[in-house]
Amino acid sequence: MNEELIAKNFHHPPWHLHGDAFILNYWLTPNFIKSNQAFQLAPSPIGRVIQIMLVRYHKSPVGPYDELLILDHPLMSKRHLSSIPKIYVSTPASVMNGQRFWGIPKQLAQFEWVIKDDVVYCNISFQQQEMSLHLQKYKHSQTFYINSHHIPAQLLNIHQTWQGLHYQFSPQFRGKLCKLKQASWKNTLDIFPDFSQAKYLQSFYVPEFKLTLPSAKMNKK
């Protein structure tokens, strides 16, 4: 790919994105974290809560795309910032821009969706391996408004390291969310931690949101 074509595929921040998402909350034990060291989860002697996000971006500067990521939250006593240690997306343009502008280690995967009433199935394929996620919404669930200003700033202060650079940025978002009934995983194999072995906490469906990704502060390692 020549330099001119590469330049056309880059869209400088800030980015403004719209979509819907599932936010899955899990409590991880120290043993779970140790057994999944390959996914770059920060160690913890007592365990902690992390989030998994499955997102469908309907509008973005690079067009619609799907995303599955781990959002690993800080250990307050050690002043670790939040990070995204593992992430898959469905388009090459999202991979290129995420790596370049935010240091996010995006990898290209295929997403297939099946939606039947209040049940959502998502199959994710990467390097000839396929995993599936089954999500069940409540038929009738109260919707709440959420804004990033309601969340402690440290939780949204994301720090990434990529190709010799440190990136730091704080996304801003607003939207609506409702409680999710259930989430189950199958065949995570080597491409994602098996969160069926972690403690599932109250999770949420976000039927609509608006997200802003600002420019990241960048420093050399």
Residue spans of the language-model regions?
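Interaction-surface and assembly-scaffold signal
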Residues: N2-L5, Q99-K221
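N-terminal domain-onset segments
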Residues: M1-E67, M76, H80-S82, K199, ...
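Generic structural hydrophobic/aromatic packing signal, biased to beta-strands
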Residues: L24-Y26, I52-L54, I70-D72, I87, ...
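Histidine (H) residue identity feature
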Residues: H11-H12, H16-H18, H58, H73, ...
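Short linear motifs at secondary-structure transitions and domain/linker junctions
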Residues: M1-E3, Y26-N31, A42-I50, V62-Y65, ...
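Aromatic- and glycine-enriched beta-alpha-beta binding-site module
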Residues: V55-E130
